[in-house]
Structures are given as structure tokens and as C-alpha cells.
UniProtKB/Swiss-Prot annotation:
InterPro entries: Metalthion_15p (IPR000347). Metallothioneins have a high content of cysteine residues that bind various heavy metals. GO terms for molecular function: metal ion binding. The lineage of its organism: Eukaryota, Viridiplantae, Streptophyta, Embryophyta, Tracheophyta. It comes from Casuarina glauca (Swamp oak). This is Metallothionein-like protein 1. The gene is MT1. Keywords: Metal-binding, Metal-thiolate cluster.
Length: 71
């Protein structure tokens, strides 16, 4: 559990290894590049920036640590 920490936006980082209990997939954050003047910019978050990890029990606790680490 020593590598369990929060990633960008105070969401669980890769060390937490949260998995979807139904699909068994690891959840990872993604980044995207926005090219201006080509397409409209989305003004709402798509979920990866949220502080709670997809409702699977992984959330940030005190001192921005994942709580609980074992999802």
C-alpha cells in the first residue's frame, strides 16, 4: 500500500490499482490535447477529473491519500 497515492486532480493514482468489480478492468486517467479554432471546447468534465474514482470505493482521504487503497 505504500505506493497508493492520489493522482492529478486529487483522484486515485496508478498505485492504488482500483479495479471495476464487474469488468475487472483497471481505471486510468487520460489526458487530451485541445487544438484551438478547430472544434468547440467542452465545458463540462468527462469524469476522469472527479475526486471520487467511478463509485468503486476509491476516494481521497486525509492528506490527499487514497482511502481505501484496496477497492
Amino acid at each position: 500500500m505504500s505506493s497508493c497515492g492520489c493522482g492529478s486532480g486529487c483522484s486515485c493514482g496508478s498505485g492504488c490499482n482500483c479495479k471495476n468489480p464487474v469488468l475487472g478492468l483497471s481505471e486510468k486517467t487520460t489526458s487530451k490535447t485541445i487544438v484551438a479554432d478547430v472544434a468547440p471546447v467542452k465545458s463540462h468534465p468527462e469524469g476522469s477529473e472527479m475526486s471520487v474514482e467511478g463509485g468503486h470505493g476509491c476516494k481521497c482521504g486525509s492528506s490527499c491519500n487514497c482511502d481505501p487503497c484496496n477497492c
